[in-house]
Amino acid sequence: MMLITTHSLPLLLLLLQLWQPLQFQEAYYEDFYFPAYSDKEDFEDFMVEFQSTGPTRPPTKEKVKRRILVNPGMPLGDSGYCNYQIMRKNVYYKYSCVTEHYFLLMQYDELQKTCYNRFVPCKNGIRKCNMSKKLVEGVYCNLTKASNIPLCQYNSFYRRGYVLITCTWQNEMQKLIPYPINDLVEPPEHTKSFLNEDGVFVVPP
């Protein structure tokens, strides 16, 4: 691990580009986290995406696993969950904080299967989303402070519900990629409620 606090961010990024291919390990710039990468190609992809001024790159399986999926360990109900994971997984848009984000405790294959489930309304009521068939544990992150990295601050909300996603076709893999996450819908507390064909929870009389 290395701590650097005396250089500007652009200079640091340049230094890291020269240094990283020789030694892959974690590095910090104040509160900004540069993760370990297994090879030079992974690191270069991260740097290109971070510094790019053009359109956002299409989602990939690796990007979904890196930015959205989490493993058991840190309690999902921890109030600092989002601040830690957002920084650790580099969930940013260019140099800006994302306004909201979801972390899901599930395997990629299970999330990818959701792309083939029936359509339901998204939380904005406009686009079509696919909904998971099973309840999933996760964390909803809502930006509360700052707009540029590394000063992003988030509120963390534990949820257990149905995942709503939109999926993008990936030509190289010839598969649908489950990205982005639209919502994590908690079911009503009433145990007899169920989902109708429109994806709406219904409580029988």
Curated annotation (Swiss-Prot):
Glycosylation sites: 130, 142
Gene Ontology, cellular component aspect: extracellular region
Disulphide bridges, residue numbers: 97-152, 115-167, 122-129
Gene3D superfamilies: Ribonuclease A-like domain (3.10.130.10)
Signal peptide: 1-24
The keyword Phosphoprotein appears for this protein: no
Biological process according to GO: defense response to Gram-positive bacterium
The UniProt record lists the keyword Ribonucleoprotein: no
Subcellular location: Secreted
GO molecular function, one term: nucleic acid binding
Keywords for this protein: Disulfide bond, Glycoprotein, Secreted, Signal
Highest taxon above the source species: Eukaryota
Family, similarity comment: Belongs to the pancreatic ribonuclease family.
Functional description taken from the UniProt entry: Does not exhibit any ribonuclease activity.
The protein's name: Inactive ribonuclease-like protein 9
Origin species: Cebus albifrons
